Amino acid sequence: MSINIEQAIIHEISQDSQGQLRCRLRPQPLLNGQAVEVMLDELHQTYTSKAGKGFGYFGIHGDDGEANPAFANALTQYRAGELGFVEFSGQASKLLQEELAKYDFSQGGFLLMSCYTSITSDYLFVALLSAKSSMTVLDDMELSQNNHLDLNNIQLAARIDLSEWQADKDSRKYISFIRGRAGRKVADFFLDFMGCVEGVNTKAQNKTLMNAVEDFVASSDLTKDERQQCRNKVFEYCSERFDEGADIEIKDLADELADQGMDSFYDFARGGSYDLDEEFPADKSTLRQLKKFSGTGGGVTLSFDGGHLGQRVIYDPISDTILIKGVPANLKDQLDRRLKGE
């Protein structure tokens, strides 16, 4: 198991017969048995590998100047030993119920809260889970319908890095959260109940890093192959940091490049007008552009490795055309079949 569980509990928020949301609070923590360990380890892995997460902190919303410190205050009391975990989680459930009641679309769910340690950091994981119907076969070979927690499709979840929060009160990224499929607006109520404000634009920071890398290789004396090796090294480093749940560190990245004979990236990135933070979370989908070109439009989707540009893939901006040398075998087969059928 990759985590050490300290506390875990589940409360239910559901609608009564009048359509009003009600809390059903569990009176004691979950026992740290195999089922709990397997569930939380799976959720930890699933959450950590989620791409496109947002990052924020306990703060005041810029638009209306409103603050909702109740969750942060309760968490502070729990960390100070003034509140028990059950009492703290119960207060959190009530806060979420009050926030959910403001919206017509909410059906409630199961609020899971867990404190655990992974590597050297303490975390508080908060998720609103839903139940999913499934079928099973009984011993007498009859079908039976049952409900189970949908752990593979978590959409409303956040994780607070308690170690970072305690060590650096000025940090703006100790809370991570899953963005809704239609953007952050889907999960606004979930962040509002915790008093979380988005603090770091992860995609923008990663895009800026990518631009800095491109400018760096363009201004260097590196050969074409060496430039692509530099891009690949940056992507590999950032991917490793993402998989570890760690931030990209510009100084650390520059040292990695220096080991490959590509000196002075740190001075280049910090000396320009890139406005890069010293540390920020990785976003694989953005940085993947260092290795691949891809685009969709007008019914055409195209994707290829960056190393093929100028060799197998020739782009002519004047005629607005792309020439592909060596059509992939499976695509060639489809095209040949279609031509024969015309």
Curated annotation (Swiss-Prot):
Keywords of the record: Cytoplasm
What InterPro entries does the record point to? Nucleoid_associated_NdpA
Citing just one GO molecular function, the answer is:
double-stranded DNA binding
Where in or outside the cell it occurs: the entry states: Cytoplasm, Nucleoid
Give Gene Ontology CC terms.
bacterial nucleoid; cytoplasm
What's the main place this protein lives?
Answer: cytoplasm
Q: Report the sequence similarity comment from the record.
A: Belongs to the YejK family.
- This protein is called Nucleoid-associated protein Sputw3181_1720
